[in-house]
Amino acid sequence: LLFNKTSTMPIKSFQAARQKLVPKRRKSLLVRDYMTRNLITFTKKQSILEVMRTLIRNKISGGPVVDELSRLIGVISEADCIKYLSEGKYFNQPFFDRNVEDSMTAEVDVIEADKTIFDAATLFHKTNRRRFPVLDRGKLVGQISRQDVVKAALLLRSQRWR
């Protein structure tokens, strides 16, 4: 305790008693830290029949199509398969003799692994998609879903967002 020169009232010194505040470790905000890494992928030469079986067996609605260097070249979904089935019936064509490249969607919205979950949230809001392939230097490294972003927000709830 110190005494003020003009008063007899003790003053507590905060200079010496001040504790060093250790900054809290900031939780990561990057897409790469919340994405799903182990994906079921397809190649452009796989048959539509094989894709349908894989989708059903794994209870998924679609997956990325990659080349031999793990570069994303498209996505194939249940909707692509159904469109193909519908067109095959209309043109009276067999539908199991075609490959993924005949039915996949080649123009794909993606997000980079080093973007923030807020960038992902904005992208989800603008496009109304449920998931995005995640790329790192042009290679597919994972997928982020709306649910992944919501989970990240819950984990980060006590942190200020900048």
Each language-model region and where it sits:
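Tandem CBS (Cystathionine beta-synthase) repeat/Bateman regulatory domains
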Residues: 1-162
